[in-house]
Structure formats: structure tokens, C-alpha cells
């Protein structure tokens, strides 16, 4: 059975508008939506919260044009030449570097190139492998990451003469023991060198070109295994922008002011920035999630929508008294991405902020970020929303058969013009060969479709296949144990992974962060026993933790707040329970 969008959701246009690169596509549509308004009434596309810097559409257009000319001059790209090279971008998660990064990528797209978005939270070894799989023509780094970028090149098989550039500015206090970067060419130097050159015309894409020309190479999150690289074409991301944008357009009565902190080297941040630009909304950028900074920013900017991840939503719900100290009346909705928001966490946040609409979604890097979003007029706790325009879903059960109805659980397979075809192990140029036949991508997520009381069908995510724990031949979803543990007042945060067991094959093991306000006189050993009783007395035998509970100070997370279960699995290799 194939599940598609509800009837009230607008259809995806056919054919897709693929005549421009994605940056120009978003800017053209934005101007069509708000360009006729008085300048002072036009929503500001991007606002840099830390330094109070606004980027208008004109400023962005001018900067993109200047950088396009500068890069063409530096690399001897002739006017009208379609370039196919790949450029690596290693940018820190700090303030206006967000916009510098985005503008740089749009300039590279105008030349025909693709951008390899490296994550600074990756190891040198991981990044070296990435630039070996996608050999870049050049690399751009932020000032604080010059040494990391140089070490990455040295660790890789790439030439030490690889053109290496730095972003011109650093925001915030200078780093201690900062390296000397005076011999590294800057963006400002490129701009100065090319200022008298003729402008470069915008790149127009021929029919079929958008489906094979790569815009971004992104790494998968690596939360459950090794990082992999996927190629995102202009068609992929334009389809995803339209899917999210058309759906959001029917749910928003006025322009929104959104708060975003997810970095642009991650697909969630990339898609959010592009979609909000396309919609004509304003985006307030923070360097990361600092609770006090965000709470102060909301009344100052009159933020209407928060783009968050579930761990941060949980952190806010645990700090209700802190939230009460600020005027948060402008906020109407919270978009939860980067992972499913379970019904218990949903309920906690609704108790703290009953007037906020909590809107969860589902997607992944391989689906170019999004496949479903919550419908504000029919929100359901634990739901990941409804299927978006142009998306088709089907589920395959453990026997390998397609499910034939509602409430049947299976691995989700997705078909959509936004879906990426394969992982990239060897890319010599920013072009791929698109599939010509119908393509269904297995997602690795286990889910089901449920018809809710409204009659609207919703997607519910059960767990990741690779995170499922096989106990005595039965599949155990870690999320079910995590949800139950979070019901206890002692648990601030938790993550459950599988550990080898000689008899059962695997057994669940829980990492737990103690809630600071809970009974400080209770020892870790006593707390483990309390949580064991709480869990094992309520759940079936295959879900029991027994003495497999580890109390920790922190749980490793990716830059966008996802729990890194692969790191947790490494920590419990050869683990034995404490003797108590």
C-alpha cells in the first residue's frame, strides 16, 4: 500500500521549476512575494542575533554577484563557461559565518560548482576521508578552523598545494593561541583583486540539468554508524523547498520571524534557511543553542517560530521557571526536526507552554531532509505529521513484504523528487547520473501510518532499524525504554543502546543523566536500583534493564542535537556491570 499527501495539501508543480540554481531560485521567488512592498515593510531575510547585523535581499544579491566574479577571476573561469568542480567548505558554527557560508555556496553554484559541506565536529580522519571521496578543487575555512583544515588536507591523499582560503572575518573574541593565518588568502583579498572585472551572468540550467548538477555534498549524521556522503542536486533541494514551502504556505496566515541555530553544513539548517528565504519570512540566526540568549532574543525580535530539536525542547520544558521570566508571547509554534518528538516529551512541553503549537516532522539527509510535517489544525502527540506534496511512502515488514494497511509497522521506503539516489564514494566532478526509472529508497526508519480521530492519516516513527535491539529474536525499540525512563523524576535525559549478551544475543543498556533537582543524597548505586525497579516492573522481560544502567554527566550529541549512539556503543564494548 502506498501512502500519499492528504487532499487538502497543494500538489507539487509538474514539471518542477528547475531553470535556476537554488540560491537564485529562492531569491527570485522571495522578490515575487514581497518585492513590491515598501522597502521598510519587507521582511528582512536574515538577522545575525549576536552582532545585530541584518542582511537584506539587495545586500545578499550584491554579495553573491561580487563573490561569483571574485572566484571566476581567481580560478580563470571564462564567462559562460559551465564549471563542474567541487569546493570544500569548513565553517564554524558562529554567527555571521552562517551567512558568509550560504552566500559563498550560492556564488559557487552560479559558476556550476558543487559544495562539500564539512562538519567541524567530525574528526580529522573522517574529514580526510570525505575529501578523498569528493576531491575538492579548493577549500574555504573559517579563521578558527584554519589549523583543522590544514591537518585534514595533510591526513588525506590530496595535494598540499590545494588552493586554501579563509573567510575574512572572525566574530566574537579572538581565540587564545590563534594560529598565524597571514599567509592564507582571504575572501576580501579575492574581492579586492576582482573589483574592476566585468560581472558574471547568472547560471541558467538547461532542461534536465537540475537533476544531475550537484549543489551540495552533505555528510549523514553518523548517529548510528560511520559518516557517509550524499550528493544533493538542485532538483533535490528545490523539490524539498517546494514540498515544505507549499505545505507551510497553507498553514501560515502572515510572515513569520523564525529562530534558527542549526548550522548550514547540516541538511536541516540548509533546508530551513532556503525554505524560509523562498517563503519571504525572516530568519534570526544564533550561533548555537544558549538558553538565556535565545530567551532574550525572543522578545527583542518578536520571534514567532522556533526551529528546534527534541533534546532542546526537553531542556526548555525542564526549565519552566526560567521561561516564565521572559515575555514569550510572540511565539506561536515550535518546529521539531532532527529526530522524532515522542508523545511524553510533547506532553511535557504542552504543559509548560500550552499556547505553543508543537509541530514535529520526519526526514533525513538521504531524503533531502523532509518527508512529513505536522498539520497545525490536527496536531497529535507522537505524530510526525502528514505526508508532504510529491512524497510517496510505503512500509516493508520483517518478512520483506509491503504492508497493506494502516497500523502495520515496517521499514519506511520513500519515493520523491527530493530523494537522493546513493552514497558517494568517488566523485570527480559535481555531476551525477540521475535514475530514469521509479526509485524507492529504504530509509532505515521503522514506522506506521495511523488514521487519527480527524480522519487524517499521520506518520508515526517507531525507531531506527540499526538502533533496534534484537533480544531472543525479538525486536526491541530503544525509544520505548527511553520514554518509560523519562517518566521518572530522577531522569533528566537518557539513551538506550544494545549490548552483546551470551544467552539473548543482545540486551538493552541505558545511559542516564540525573535530573539535578532530584534527591542529591541518593547515591548512583541507589539510583540505578530505583530506575531498574521503575523500568523492569512495568515493561516486558525483553525490555528489562536489570543492572545495565550507567549514570553519566553528559551524552554525546551531534552539532544539531542528535544523540550519537555510535559513540555510546563504543563506550560499552566489553562492559561489565558494577558489583554492588
Swiss-Prot record:
| Family named by the database record | Belongs to the ATP-dependent AMP-binding enzyme family.
What pathway does the UniProt record associate with this protein?
Secondary metabolite biosynthesis
Q: Does the keyword ATP-binding apply?
A: yes
In alphabetical order, the GO MF annotations are: ATP binding; CoA-ligase activity
Species source reads: Lecanicillium sp
Report residues binding ATP.
338, 464, 562
Tell me the protein's name.
AMP-dependent ligase vlmC
Known PANTHER family for this protein?
BCDNA.GH02901, LONG-CHAIN-FATTY-ACID--COA LIGASE
Instruction: State the encoding gene.
Output: vlmC
Amino acid at each position: 500500500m502506498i501512502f500519499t499527501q492528504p487532499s487538502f495539501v497543494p500538489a507539487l508543480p509538474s514539471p518542477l521549476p528547475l531553470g535556476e540554481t537554488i540560491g537564485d531560485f529562492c531569491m527570485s521567488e522571495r522578490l515575487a512575494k514581497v518585492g513590491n512592498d515598501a522597502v521598510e515593510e519587507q521582511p528582512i531575510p536574515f538577522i545575525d542575533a549576536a552582532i545585530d547585523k541584518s542582511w537584506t535581499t539587495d545586500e545578499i544579491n550584491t554579495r553573491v554577484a561580487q563573490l561569483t566574479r571574485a572566484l571566476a577571476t581567481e580560478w580563470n573561469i571564462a564567462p559562460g563557461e559551465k564549471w563542474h568542480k567541487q569546493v570544500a567548505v569548513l565553517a564554524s558554527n558562529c554567527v555571521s559565518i552562517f551567512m558568509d557560508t550560504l552566500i559563498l555556496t550560492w556564488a559557487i553554484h552560479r559558476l556550476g560548482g558543487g559544495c562539500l559541506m564539512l562538519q567541524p565536529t567530525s574528526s580529522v580522519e573522517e574529514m580526510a576521508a570525505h575529501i578523498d571521496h569528493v576531491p575538492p578543487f579548493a577549500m574555504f575555512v573559517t579563521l578558527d578552523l584554519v589549523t583543522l583544515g590544514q591537518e585534514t588536507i595533510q591526513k588525506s591523499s590530496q595535494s598540499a598545494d590545494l588552493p586554501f582560503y579563509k573567510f575574512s572575518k572572525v566574530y566574537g573574541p579572538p581565540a587564545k593561541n590563534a594560529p598565524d593565518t597571514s599567509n592564507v588568502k582571504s575572501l576580501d583579498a579575492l574581492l579586492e583583486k576582482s573589483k574592476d572585472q566585468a560581472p558574471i551572468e547568472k547560471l541558467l540550467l538547461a532542461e534536465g540539468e537540475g537533476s544531475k548538477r550537484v549543489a551540495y555534498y552533505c555528510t549523514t549524521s553518523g548517529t548510528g554508524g560511520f559518516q557517509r556522503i550524499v550528493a544533493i542536486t538542485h532538483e533535490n533541494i528545490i523539490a524539498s523547498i517546494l514540498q515544505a514551502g507549499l505545505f507551510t504556505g497553507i498553514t501560515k496566515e502572515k510572515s513569520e520571524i523564525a529562530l534558527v541555530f542549526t548550522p548550514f553544513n547540516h541538511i536541516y539548517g540548509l533546508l530551513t534557511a532556503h525554505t524560509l528565504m523562498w517563503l519571504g519570512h525572516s530568519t534570526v540566526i544564533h550561533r548555537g543553542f544558549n538558553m538565556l540568549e535565545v530567551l532574550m532574543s525572543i522578545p527583542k525580535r518578536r520571534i514567532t517560530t522556533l526551529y528546534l530539536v527534541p533534546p532542546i525542547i526537553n531542556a526548555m520544558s525542564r526549565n519552566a521557571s526560567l521561561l516564565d521570566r521572559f515575555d514569550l508571547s510572540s511565539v506561536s509554534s515550535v518546529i521539531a526536526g532532527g529526530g522524532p518528538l515522542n508523545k511524553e516529551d510533547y506532553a511535557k512541553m504542552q504543559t509548560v507552554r500550552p499556547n505553543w503549537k508543537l509541530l514535529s516532522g520526519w526526514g533525513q539527509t538521504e531524503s533531502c531532509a523532509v518527508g512529513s510535517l505536522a498539520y497545525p489544525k490536527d496536531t497529535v502527540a507522537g505524530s510526525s505529521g502528514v505526508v508532504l506534496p510529491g512524497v510517496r511512502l510505503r512500509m516493508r515488514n520483517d518478512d520483506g513484504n509491503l504492508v497493506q494497511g494502516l497500523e502495520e509497522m515496517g521499514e519506511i521506503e520513500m519515493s520523491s523528487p527530493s530523494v537522493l539516489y546513493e552514497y558517494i564514494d568517488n566523485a570527480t566532478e559535481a555531476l551525477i547520473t540521475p535514475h530514469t526509472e521509479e526509485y524507492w529508497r529504504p530509509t532505515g526508519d521503522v514506522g506506521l501510518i495511523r488514521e487519527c480521530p480527524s480522519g487524517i492519516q499521520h506518520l508515526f516513527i517507531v525507531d531506527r532499524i540499526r538502533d533496534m535491539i534484537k533480544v531472543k529474536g525479538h525486536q526491541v525499540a530503544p525509544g520505548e525504554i527511553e520514554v518509560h525512563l523519562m517518566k521518572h523524576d530522577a531522569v533528566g535525559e537518557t539513551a538506550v543502546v544494545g549490548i552483546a549478551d551470551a544467552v539473548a544475543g543482545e540486551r538493552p543498556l541505558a545511559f542516564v543523566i540525573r535530573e539535578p533537582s532530584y534527591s542529591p543524597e541518593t547515591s548512583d548505586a541507589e539510583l540505578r536500583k530505583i530506575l531498574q525497579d521503575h523500568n523492569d516492573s512495568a515493561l516486558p522481560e525483553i525490555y528489562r534493564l536489570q543492572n545495565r544502567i550507567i549514570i553519566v554527566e553528559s551524552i554525546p550529541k551531534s552539532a544539531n542535537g542528535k544523540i550519537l549512539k555510535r559513540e555510546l556503543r563504543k563506550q560499552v564494548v566489553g562492559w561489565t556491570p558494577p558489583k554492588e
